[in-house]
Amino acid sequence: DGRIALMGDAAHAMLPYHAQGAVQGIEDAWVLARTLQLHGDDDPAAALRRYEALRKHRAQRLQQHSRNAERWYHLDDADEVAHRDARFRRHAEDNPDGFTKQQVWLYAYDAEQAALGTDDDWRALPDW
């Protein structure tokens, strides 16, 4: 009936490969609080639906990419390991002091802008 919100691991447990478990809980709390502040007096259930819509996609993408990272970090095949390591080296050579597009998407999320509905860039996660 729209009166309960889950957040953090209760809503979307994370594997440790992007160190996002606690971070996602903090993002959830911020977006939920701000969404309720902005819309909760008029229609709390609608505010909770908005919170879910704002957070669900990002959390699901992070879960998927964390599963992908698990595979990358635990390869058994020597050829696959060599291919992975070559990709890491190329990135380091091409961009020694910067972040990948994926890292920017991961670490530059602005919960305030998301809650206000003014930042849709977080939806477009580049392929890893």
Language-model regions: role of each:
Residues 1-68, 72-73:
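Conserved mid-domain beta->alpha element of the FAD-binding
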